[in-house]
């Protein structure tokens, strides 16, 4: 009799879990569909002046099959140029070659949608609440509406969002594949938008700070023989995966060399802040 009741309870529990999974899948499908529609609407139909320059730079690179570090469209002869987003320029030119300006607009809609889905996926992992994740995603995309354009920054937003997702996964699971993903993101940013490459390291700092604080707490508690108590508002948990995160961050410093731009990833930001990117 007892076994029968136990089996009935287990079956009810399984049914409830199955229903919850179905609800979750349905909500995610609906949420993703709404996000794609909303993000596509945010993409501007009119293109910026930079788009024409981007197309020609990409064409120039493919025609010459090299990056000569000189501006081919300047009035001045042999004017140095750093090609800060050469890979993006090539990609946009290839899209333009296939679909013209309409193709670039469609690609902007697609990138915008990918950004929205990436934010939703990352928030779902962090917040653990589908509705809150959806609301945050819509709000974030609305705030970013002025930056949704056929420019390298749109792809960079996607990569930074994916970086946060991979860092969370690596910190929680210590699985190597997430570290490999972070290294690939470092290489992509160095080639797609070199100006913001140094900023990817800033995203590592909160994890390192959290880890250091938890170590200090543990040592302090051990020294005074006290038990660690959870904070009322902020709870810091020591995650061993952060050690691997630090190793990956150090490796990512070398990703700036995996580019045809030489040492530009290490110097471009400083030169930009100094107001000189031609030396």
Regions found by a protein language model. Give the residues of each.
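Short hydrophobic alpha-helices at membrane interfaces in multi-pass membrane enzymes
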Residues: 169-187, 243-244
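Short hydrophobic/aromatic helix or loop-helix immediately within or flanking a transmembrane segment
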Residues: 76-102, 106
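Specific aromatic-rich, kink-prone transmembrane helix
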Residues: 118, 143, 155-173, 204-216
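Transmembrane catalytic cores of multi-pass membrane glycosyltransferases
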Residues: 46, 50, 62-67, 194-279
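Short acidic/glycine- and proline-prone juxtamembrane loop motifs at membrane-interface regions
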Residues: 147-155
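Transmembrane-helix signature of polytopic, membrane-embedded enzymes
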Residues: 119-142
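Transmembrane-helix motifs of polytopic, lipid-linked glycan transferases
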Residues: 106-126
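Membrane-interface alpha helices of multi-pass inner-membrane proteins
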Residues: 140-144, 178-195, 254-255
């Amino acid at each position: 009799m007892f076994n029968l009741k136990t089996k009935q309870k287990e079956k009810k529990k399984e049914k409830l879990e199955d229903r919850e999974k179905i609800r979750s899948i349905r909500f995610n499908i609906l949420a993703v569909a709404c996000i794609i529609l909303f993000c596509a609407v945010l993409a501007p139909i009119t293109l910026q002046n930079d788009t024409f320059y981007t197309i020609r730079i990409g064409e120039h690179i493919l025609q010459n099959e090299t990056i000569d570090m000189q501006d081919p469209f300047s009035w001045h002869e042999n004017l140095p140029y750093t090609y800060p987003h050469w890979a993006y320029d090539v990609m946009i030119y290839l899209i333009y070659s296939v679909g013209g300006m309409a193709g670039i607009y469609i690609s902007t809609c697609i990138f915008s949608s990918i950004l929205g889905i990436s934010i939703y996926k990352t928030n779902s992992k962090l917040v653990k609440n589908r509705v809150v994740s959806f609301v945050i995603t819509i709000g974030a995309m609305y705030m970013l509406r002025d930056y949704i354009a056929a420019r390298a920054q749109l792809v960079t937003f996607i990569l930074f969002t994916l970086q946060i997702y991979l860092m969370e996964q690596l910190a929680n699971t210590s699985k190597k594949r997430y570290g490999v993903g972070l290294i690939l993101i470092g290489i992509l940013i160095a080639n797609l938008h070199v100006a913001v490459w140094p900023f990817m390291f800033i995203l590592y700092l909160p994890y390192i700070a959290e880890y250091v604080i938890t170590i200090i707490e543990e040592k302090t508690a051990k020294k005074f023989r006290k038990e660690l108590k959870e904070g009322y508002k902020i709870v810091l948990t020591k995650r061993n995966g952060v050690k691997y995160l630090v190793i990956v961050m150090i490796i990512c410093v070398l990703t700036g060399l995996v580019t045809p731009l030489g040492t530009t990833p290490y110097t471009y930001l400083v030169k930009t802040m100094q107001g000189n990117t031609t030396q």
